[in-house]
Structures are given as C-alpha cells and as structure tokens.
C-alpha cells in the first residue's frame, strides 16, 4: 500500500488541482454544451450562492411531462445481477431473445447460482462469480420446478422457440472486440463506444490494452468479492486516461507551436468527472445499523483500507505514468464518494416480464393453448421471472438536481424507456425559472428520520415540508 500513499505525497499539487471545483464560467460552459448535446433545452444548470449548483426550468412542464433523459457517464450492471439479465454492457438494453433470457436464468438456477440483487451492497457482500427506479423488481423464490437440462440448453442456444416471442424482438448479442467473455453489446456502435471510453483498458481478453491482465483479473475478483463500486471507479479512471491520450494525440496532430502542459490536458480529460460533488468515500458512507457508534473510527479505517487494496490492484493493471495523479488514494476515495452521494439506481425492466404478461392477456382459448407450453417455464422461474437489470450509474445532469422532501420531479421509467438512461418526469406542474428537485430518500418518513438520512449527504434539508415539520416538534 506504500506506493498508493507515495502517489498522494508526491503528486499532492496535482491531486489538489484535480479535486478543486471548476471555476463557475467553465462549469456553466460545460453544462450548457451538455444540455445542447442532450437536446433537453427546457432546463439549465445554474449556481446558487447558498446551495451550489442546481437544475432550473427555463420553460414550463406539465404534470407527468418528460423533463430530462440523461445519458450515463459511467455505469455498471451489478455483478450479482449478471446471472439474471443479459444486457448490453454500454447502454444496458436487454439483448438476445426471450428464449435466451429465460434459458440463461434457468441454467444458472439449475446450477444453484442466483443473483443477490441487493442495492445496498456493502464491503462484506458476497457476489456471484459470472463468466460468460421506482419500479419493483422480482424477488427470489426458494423453490422451483426444474426443467430437463436439454430443454434449457435448447432455449439458450436458439434451438427452441416459444410462442409469441416474435412480439418481443431483442438485438442479437455482439461479443467484446477485445475477446473477453464478460462484455456483450446490442450493436457495433455500443461496442465501439465502450471500447473507446473505458473497456479497452478494463477488458480481460487477449486484445486488452491493460498492462497486466492477471492483475486486472485480481482487481475484478476483489471487487466482486467485496464491493462492485470499485468496478465503476475503475471505469472513471480508465475513461479519464483514454480521454487524456486522445486529447494529447489531437494536440500533437495540430502541430501546435507551443506544447500543451500535461497537467492542463489531464485536467481537461478529467472535467466530466470533476463536475460531480465529492467527498471521501470512507468519510461519507453511512454507518451500517449493525456497527456500534463506538466502532465508527475502526469501520471507516476498514473502508479506507479496502479502497487502498483495490487501488493497488488497479494500479498494477492499468497504470499510466503521465496520469499518475489519478492513482492516488485521495482521488480514488473521492471518485467513490461522488458515486455514493450522486449515483442513481440503474434499472431496466425485463422484456421477459412483458412476455408473460402478454400471454396472460391473451383470449381464453388461445391463452390456455399457449400456457401448455409456457407455464412450465414460468413455474420454473418462480417469482424471479420479472427480475430487472439492476446497477448503478453517474448521470451528469441528474446529479445536479437538489433534494426536496416535497419534490416536483422524480426518476421514473416509462414503458418506452428500455435502456439505462435516467428519465426524469414532472410530478406536478413546474413553472419557468422554478428549481427542479427530486427526493434522495423516502420523503414519507418522519422528520427526524429524514434529517438523519440526509445528514449522510452532508446537509440539513430546509424545504417547506421540513420547515413545517420542525416547527411542530
């Protein structure tokens, strides 16, 4: 661990520059460009002197109207969820076919492997090793009817077709261009975008651009055994390194008379990550209920040491000398802390659930005939038939939305929203120039419980609901 701490010591000035807030004009320019590229011209990001940046409406929104669809900067599907759902590793859209989705799930279930879809994963989580919103996701069933292995294999391999699945077409899976067996895609464009943005450094395949595939494998195993948020932090670092290399190459191509300092190129490459509010992970993570307050110091040191071990493995795997400041523990801790404070659950509804609901809505005679074929599969899946894709992601614009216990907007996936983008919908009419707010917590909780939860985010809520509740105590 010494080398990680030495990086913090030797690159203290560079680390401080990376973690320094962007000047307001640069921040405004960045978000203006982002809003233009997202084509969401009904909003703007503005800095408020008292609460920092926020999202404001520059046009009126009606109740249930779409405010924003925000693309992911970095996101992951939870490791445990990969046995339940085969999705594109870049946009998180379901891929393959209804038959393949059902076949994979039953195959892993027959092996005794199931996803542990726990959104509140901790450093002690045991996640499945895998090779190859407000919406409610399906739970797990302790018992199920096992189908013959040959039937399951036929489903997975496309040798068996179920009735009416043509109504639910899915993109064919494309393998990772680097040759790993972990990443699959819905299209060539998603495969290329993921490769260029981060996966080329994080791929474990033969064409990986990492400097040690063995160390990368150890890093991934450590993350899967402890907390898969490390995989997301690795994506942020790989994203910045690759962006730095691209900016440097473009600068060389321009044959500029004056060489651009490496630090300014690194700061520019880091900019998309720099805009998120940050605190060190071990400082901002909520104290678990089963940890005695007297043990808080030891708990937070344990979290810090866990991050240090993870970073050491990542550094061996993808280290870049020109971007060495990125491999400081201070940077790593702040990246993960940014996710802790800003991330939104990544949820994509399963087309398998839609398929069985479609069967259930068929006319009685046709339904009875169809269910003679489909019912054994539904029974074998149990409650897990409706499992959705679950993960976590950082969304640049959504992360700027401030909290209110009486919010005027919410994250909500509509029927047509079939990928990992964040979808923000108006809960009521929103006036022009009004701030767009969402709730970070369950706003129906009692006042003191709300304030305790929000303290983990580093603020005390003073929305109209909290002011009213506090006056009655």
Curated annotation (Swiss-Prot):
Keywords on record: Chromatin regulator, Metal-binding, Methyltransferase, Nucleus, S-adenosyl-L-methionine, Transferase, Zinc, Zinc-finger
Any GO molecular function: zinc ion binding
GO cellular component: nucleus
Enzyme class, broadest EC rank: transferase
Annotated residues for binding of S-adenosyl-L-methionine: 440
Zn-finger (MYND-type) residues: 134-203
Entry EC no(s): 2.1.1.-
PROSITE patterns reported in the protein's UniProt record: SET
Record field: catalytic activity: L-lysyl-[histone] + S-adenosyl-L-methionine = N(6)-methyl-L-lysyl-[histone] + S-adenosyl-L-homocysteine + H(+)
Disruption phenotype: Reduced callus formation from somatic cells associated with an impaired reduction of H3K9me3 deposition and lower accumulation of H3K36me3 at LBD16 and LBD29 loci during leaf-to-callus transition. Lower lateral root formation and impaired ability to form adventitious root formation from wounded leaf tissues. The double mutant jmj30-2 atxr2-1 is strongly impaired in callus formation.
Domain of life (superkingdom): Eukaryota
One GO biological process term: lateral root formation
SUPFAM superfamilies per the UniProt record, alphabetical: HIT/MYND zinc finger-like, SET domain
Entry annotated with the keyword Nucleotide-binding: no
Segments forming domain SET: 33-441
Residues involved in Zn(2+) binding: 176, 180, 199, 203
Any coiled-coil regions, as ranges: none
Function statement: Histone methyltransferase that methylates 'Lys-36' (H3K36me) of histone H3 to produce H3K36me3. Promotes early stages of cellular dedifferentiation through H3K36me3-dependent, and to a lesser degree H3K4me3-dependent, activation of Lateral organ Boundaries-Domain (LBD) (e.g. LBD16 and LBD29) genes. Positive regulator of root organogenesis including lateral root formation as well as adventitious root formation from wounded leaf tissues. Recruited by JMJ30/ARF (e.g.
Family: Belongs to the class V-like SAM-binding methyltransferase superfamily. Histone-lysine methyltransferase family. TRX/MLL subfamily.
Subunit structure of this chain's protein: Interacts with JMJ30. Binds to ARF7 and ARF19 in the nucleus.
Protein name per Swiss-Prot or TrEMBL: Histone-lysine N-methyltransferase ATXR2
Source organism per UniProt: Arabidopsis thaliana
């Amino acid at each position: 661990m010494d080398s990680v701490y030495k990086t913090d010591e030797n690159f203290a000035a560079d680390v401080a520059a990376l973690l320094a807030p962007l000047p307001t004009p640069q921040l405004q320019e960045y978000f203006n460009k982002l809003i233009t590229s997202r084509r969401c011209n009904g909003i703007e990001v503005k800095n408020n002197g008292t609460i920092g940046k926020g999202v404001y409406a520059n046009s009126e929104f009606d109740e249930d109207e779409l405010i924003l669809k925000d693309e992911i900067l970095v996101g992951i599907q939870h490791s445990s969820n990969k046995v339940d759902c085969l999705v594109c590793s870049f946009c998180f859209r379901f891929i393959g076919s209804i038959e393949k989705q059902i076949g994979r799930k039953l195959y892993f279930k027959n092996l005794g492997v199931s996803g542990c879809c726990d959104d509140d994963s901790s450093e002690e989580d045991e996640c499945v090793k895998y090779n190859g919103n407000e919406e409610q996701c399906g739970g797990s069933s302790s018992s199920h009817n096992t189908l013959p292995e040959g039937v399951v294999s036929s489903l997975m391999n496309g040798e068996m077709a179920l009735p009416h699945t043509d109504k639910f077409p899915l993109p064919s899976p494309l393998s990772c261009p680097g040759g790993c067996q972990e990443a699959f895609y819905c299209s060539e464009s998603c495969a290329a975008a993921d490769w260029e943005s981060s996966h080329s450094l994080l791929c474990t395949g033969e064409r990986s651009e990492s400097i040690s595939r063995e160390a990368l494998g150890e890093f991934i195993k450590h993350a899967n055994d402890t907390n898969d948020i490390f995989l997301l932090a690795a994506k942020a670092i790989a994203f910045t390194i690759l962006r730095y290399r691209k900016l440097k190459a473009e600068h060389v191509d321009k044959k500029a008379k004056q060489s651009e300092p490496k630090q300014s190129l690194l700061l520019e490459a880091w900019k998309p990550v720099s805009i998120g509010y940050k605190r060190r992970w071990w400082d901002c993570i909520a104290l678990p209920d089963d940890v005695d307050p007297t043990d808080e110091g030891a708990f937070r040191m344990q979290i810090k040491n866990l991050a240090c071990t993870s970073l050491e493995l990542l550094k061996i795997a993808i280290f870049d000398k020109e971007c060495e400041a990125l491999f400081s523990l201070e940077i790593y801790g702040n990246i993960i802390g940014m996710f802790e404070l800003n991330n939104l659950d990544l949820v994509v509804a399963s087309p398998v659930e839609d398929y069985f609901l479609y069967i259930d809505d068929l006319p009685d005679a046709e339904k009875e005939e169809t269910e003679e074929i489909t019912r054994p599969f539904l029974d074998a899946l149990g409650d897990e038939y409706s499992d959705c894709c679950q993960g976590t992601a950082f969304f640049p614009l959504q992360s700027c939305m401030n909290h209110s216990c009486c919010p005027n907007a919410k994250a909500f996936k509509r029927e047509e929203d079939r990928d990992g983008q964040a979808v923000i919908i108006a809960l009521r009419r929103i006036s022009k120039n009004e701030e767009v707010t969402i709730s970070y917590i369950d706003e129906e909780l009692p006042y003191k419980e709300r304030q305790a939860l929000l303290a983990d985010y580093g603020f005390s809520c003073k929305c109209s609901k909290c002011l009213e509740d506090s006056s009655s105590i």
